[in-house]
């Protein structure tokens, strides 16, 4: 007889083959049509709000793996918090002004860009940005990221621009904004000032030269400086010495050179000289001494500075206040002239004399040659070092003194207030606090003006009569109200008299004759105002619960946001900050087109599905740098298959089960009580990991639970009961009750990580209380399901089971058995406690070990296990053709001559 029809074989439409690439778009359509995101807010309208504020990516290209990972991590948070019962609005945003976009537009125009008016360039920039907003929006949605995609915040929207100006007005009112002629990072290619957050450091080869400056009062004595920027020597006005260092005068041939004693040996070895020390003195003894400039007929004065170090060079620092922040500060102290004879394109101006018209990088060679010819050059070489580059064009930048607008970070103790706010924030990982604190402590004033057109104009006006440049709160407010209606294009389209209040007069001379200025705001101010434009002004809870971005944002968005929020609102804009590292390839190298190791996230999605990409994100310890490559993604495909098969097993064995079939805990079999107890521990552990943003631990614990605890133990053991026992028997319903709770918890736990698969499983299950799993609530830990004594007992039984499995494997290798059901296992536990435990659970040991018979015995000679001695023999009796177990009484039932007594009872309907 074919007994297959008498078994409760698994049934489900949840296929083993995922086919995510085709199914996921259908799921997205389902979520959209059913308005699931909107319903998550409606069903939790009266619940506490949890706000993760989205840091806006630049709308200047397709998403890359880093932006994909960032949005997926945010989606883990918002989906989890929604299931925890919070109202979780998520408004995605885009950064749409600034150099990255303008650079792309002007580069594509080539020479045509110079023929375009500012208004025309701005129109093209807007079109470009909005095009990529739409492209990125669809890409993020395809990743399964939920949010208010139809109503994102976009920094070029007039309402958003209004709030930028409103925050800026507060800073001006507070006196934190000033105009100064001081050195700033300047990109000669992009022809604009840059802030610290717009600087990248790359290796760069520079000249390395030692130059001697002749003392005016002692023509045979020279102070030796070292520099890697010969092009700044035309702007030199001083030489800085440390006041407390010991300096030496050394005799070299017929000359005397002055260098720091602490660098003497290194210097002498580098330039290859023999010398004799003739005098020692401290730096402050030379203060005020004059030297002759090596290129021009003027003098350079000796000044003192604490920043002089003994790391490199000579301890005598070439000082050009027009080309360095520290030099500038020293210049203020000594009232030195600020020379910066370089124009916007990095060419020398007429103030540089013979070098006029030369680009600074080309001038290096010419200046070194001139120094050599006039006898001032001691040695010239090359040095490879980390040098600042523009974040957009990737070219080297310079420090250049130009009139710019700045935010003073110390006025009104703003820096001090920000440092206090930093302490109140929870940082993940904890070192984030140390990092941003150090950056804030050391940062200079914020250069906020840009010599570009694609941005929010700084509404400063210049008096045509006296030349005074004025930035007044009432002008900003007047312009902001215009912007609310017409956007910032108004600055480029309207007459200046329409942009200022009718009664506004020049504070310096009383004139009403003005012209517009043309600087725009640093784009970091745009995004740094998002807390006001998107959250606070809309009446949402403030400060928000979380900012989550790459760890480069400690000097970017986190810093701009906390400075602006502290200045305007008196508080940090966030309660917690989570940062992630950067993506590297499988060898740990940075991803770059030149290495050919860039991975497009949409290629992964289109080949494997978004859930595979999301699973990879969950697998990473994202607080550090993250590796990815083909092999790593393939590993996730295999892990996904295991998770999917676990879900499939659970679903396929609950096909005839409803909540009406649930058994009360006290009626469950011991093994099922153990499974439910372990489930509660798992839920408790996973919840802690989700709360701490430890998704790699969620991933590892879930994979381990599914593969080790479920598939390799519990689910394997259950097959006999599920398939063979009577459909409605307590044996099967007890198992199904446990599977019900496991499936329910597992689907919910996986929902934030792999939302498509979780939804598919939910829709195929008997669990549907809502339209979508993403409207469900997080599984609660049910303490009544935890029997600590029973859990401890099964921990010991599992250890004995390991010994049994080893013995079975040995027996299989020795051809004593083929399948474990061929076995009769004889066990001798190694201590009295374990012997008593085996006696207590003797009736379930055959099921637990998946064998036909278990005998507890003494003094056996089998496998010497760690916890038990185990002897494996071939089971006696005939093999039951229904359950495949061996039993001495198989075949004695005339009605069912091929079955064991248990199966005969099931077939007769006698085993309930």
Curated annotation (Swiss-Prot):
IleRS has two distinct active sites: one for aminoacylation and one for editing. The misactivated valine is translocated from the active site to the editing site, which sterically excludes the correctly activated isoleucine. The single editing site contains two valyl binding pockets, one specific for each substrate (Val-AMP or Val-tRNA(Ile)). Pfam families: Anticodon_1, tRNA-synt_1, zf-FPG_IleRS. Its cofactor is Zn(2+). A motif ('KMSKS' region) lies at residues 590-594. It catalyses: tRNA(Ile) + L-isoleucine + ATP = L-isoleucyl-tRNA(Ile) + AMP + diphosphate. ATP binds at residue 593. It comes from the Bacteria. Keywords: Aminoacyl-tRNA synthetase, ATP-binding, Cytoplasm, Ligase, Metal-binding, Nucleotide-binding, Protein biosynthesis, Zinc. Catalyzes the attachment of isoleucine to tRNA(Ile). As IleRS can inadvertently accommodate and process structurally similar amino acids such as valine, to avoid such errors it has two additional distinct tRNA(Ile)-dependent editing activities. One activity is designated as 'pretransfer' editing and involves the hydrolysis of activated Val-AMP. The other activity is designated 'posttransfer' editing and involves deacylation of mischarged Val-tRNA(Ile). It comes from Fervidobacterium pennivorans (strain DSM 9078 / Ven5). GO terms for cellular component: cytosol. Its EC number is 6.1.1.5. It is found in: Cytoplasm. This is Isoleucine--tRNA ligase. Belongs to the class-I aminoacyl-tRNA synthetase family. IleS type 1 subfamily. The keyword Translocase does not apply. A motif ('HIGH' region) lies at residues 57-67. Zn(2+) binds at residues 880, 883, 900, 903. PROSITE patterns: AA_TRNA_LIGASE_I. L-isoleucyl-5'-AMP binds at residue 549. The keyword Transcription does not apply.
């Amino acid at each position: 007889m074919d007994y297959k029809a008498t078994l409760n074989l698994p049934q489900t439409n949840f296929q083993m083959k995922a086919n995510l690439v085709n199914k996921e778009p259908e799921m997205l359509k389902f979520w959209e049509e059913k308005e699931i995101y909107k319903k998550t807010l409606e069903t939790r309208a009266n619940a506490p709000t949890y706000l993760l504020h989205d840091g806006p990516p630049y709308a200047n290209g397709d998403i890359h793996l880093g932006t994909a990972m960032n949005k997926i991590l945010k989606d883990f948070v918002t989906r989890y918090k929604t299931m925890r019962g919070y109202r979780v609005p998520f408004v995605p945003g885009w950064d749409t002004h600034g150099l990255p976009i303008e650079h792309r537009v002007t580069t594509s125009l080539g020479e045509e860009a110079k023929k375009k008016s500012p208004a025309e360039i701005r129109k093209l920039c807007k079109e470009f940005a909005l095009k990529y907003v739409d492209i990125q929006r669809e890409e993020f949605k395809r990743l399964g990221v939920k949010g208010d995609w139809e109503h994102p915040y976009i920094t070029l929207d007039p309402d958003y621009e209004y709030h930028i100006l409103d925050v800026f007005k507060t800073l001006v009112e507070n006196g934190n904004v000033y105009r100064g002629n001081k050195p700033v990072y300047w990109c000669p290619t992009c022809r604009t000032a840059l802030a610290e957050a717009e600087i990248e450091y790359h290796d760069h080869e520079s000249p390395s030269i030692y130059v001697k400056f002749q003392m005016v009062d002692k023509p045979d004595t020279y102070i030796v400086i070292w520099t890697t920027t010969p092009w700044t020597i035309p702007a030199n006005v001083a030489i800085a010495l440390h006041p407390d260092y010991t300096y030496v005068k050394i005799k070299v041939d017929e000359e005397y050179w002055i260098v720091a004693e602490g660098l003497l040996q290194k210097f002498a070895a580098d330039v290859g000289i023999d010398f004799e020390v003739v005098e020692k003195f401290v730096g402050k003894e030379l203060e005020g001494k004059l030297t002759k400039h090596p290129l021009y007929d003027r003098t350079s004065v000796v000044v003192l500075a604490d920043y002089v170090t003994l790391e490199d060079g000579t301890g005598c620092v070439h000082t050009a206040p027009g080309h360095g922040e520290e030099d500038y500060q020293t210049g203020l102290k000594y009232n030195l002239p600020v020379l910066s004879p370089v124009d916007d394109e990095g060419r020398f101006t007429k103030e540089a004399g013979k070098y006029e018209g030369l680009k600074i990088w080309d001038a290096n060679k010419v200046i070194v040659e001139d120094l050599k010819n006039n006898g001032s050059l001691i040695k010239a070489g090359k040095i490879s070092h980390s040098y600042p580059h523009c974040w957009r064009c990737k070219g080297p930048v310079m420090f250049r003194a130009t009139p710019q607008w700045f935010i003073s970070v110390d006025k009104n103790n703003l820096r001090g207030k920000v440092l206090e706010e930093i302490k109140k924030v929870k940082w993940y990982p904890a070192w984030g606090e140390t990092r941003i604190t150090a950056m804030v402590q050391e940062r200079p004033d914020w250069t906020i003006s840009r010599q570009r057109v694609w941005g929010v104009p700084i509404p400063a006006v210049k008096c045509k009569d006296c030349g005074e440049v004025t930035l007044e709160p009432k002008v900003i407010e007047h312009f902001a109200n215009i912007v609310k209606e017409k956007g910032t294009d108004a600055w480029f389209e309207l007459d200046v008299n329409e942009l200022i209040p009718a009664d506004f007069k020049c504070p310096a001379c009383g004139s009403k004759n003005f012209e517009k200025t043309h600087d725009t705001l640093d784009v970091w101010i745009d995004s740094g105002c998002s807390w006001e434009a998107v959250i606070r002004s809309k009446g949402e809870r403030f400060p928000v619960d979380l900012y989550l971005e790459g760890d480069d944002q400690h000097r970017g968005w986190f810093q701009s946001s906390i400075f602006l929020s502290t200045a305007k609102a008196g508080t940090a804009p966030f309660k917690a900050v989570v940062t992630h590292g950067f993506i590297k390839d499988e060898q740990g190298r940075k991803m770059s087109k030149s290495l050919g190791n860039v991975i497009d996230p949409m290629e992964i999605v289109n080949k494997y599905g978004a859930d595979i990409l999301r699973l990879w994100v969950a697998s990473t310890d994202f607080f550090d740098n993250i590796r990815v490559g083909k092999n790593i993604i393939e590993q996730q495909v295999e892990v996904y298959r295991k998770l999917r098969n676990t879900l499939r097993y659970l679903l396929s064995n609950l096909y005839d089960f409803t909540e009406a079939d649930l058994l009360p805990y006290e009626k469950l079999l011991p093994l099922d009580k153990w499974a439910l107890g372990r489930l509660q521990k798992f839920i408790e552990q996973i919840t802690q990991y989700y709360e701490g943003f430890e998704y790699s631990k969620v991933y590892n614990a879930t994979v381990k639970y599914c593969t080790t605890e479920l598939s390799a133990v519990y689910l394997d053991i259950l097959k006999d009961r599920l398939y063979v026992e009577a459909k409605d028997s307590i044996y099967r319903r007890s198992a199904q009750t446990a599977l019900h709770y496991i499936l329910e918890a597992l689907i919910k736990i996986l929902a934030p990580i792999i939302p498509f698969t979780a939804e598919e499983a939910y829709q195929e299950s008997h669990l549907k209380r809502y339209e979508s799993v993403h409207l469900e609530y997080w599984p609660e830990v049910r303490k009544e399901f935890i029997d600590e004594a029973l859990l401890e007992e099964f921990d010991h039984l599992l250890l004995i089971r390991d010994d049994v499995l080893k013995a079975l494997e040995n027996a299989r290798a020795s051809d004593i058995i083929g399948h474990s059901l061929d076995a009769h296992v004889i066990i001798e536990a190694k201590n009295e406690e374990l012997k008593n435990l085996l006696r207590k659970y003797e009736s379930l040991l055959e099921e637990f070990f998946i064998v036909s018979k278990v005998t507890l015995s003494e003094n056996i000679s089998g496998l010497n296990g760690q916890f038990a001695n185990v002897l494996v023999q071939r089971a006696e009796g005939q093999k039951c053709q229904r359950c495949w177990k061996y039993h001495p009484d198989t075949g004695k039932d005339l009605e069912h001559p091929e079955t064991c007594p248990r199966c005969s009872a099931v077939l007769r309907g006698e085993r309930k």
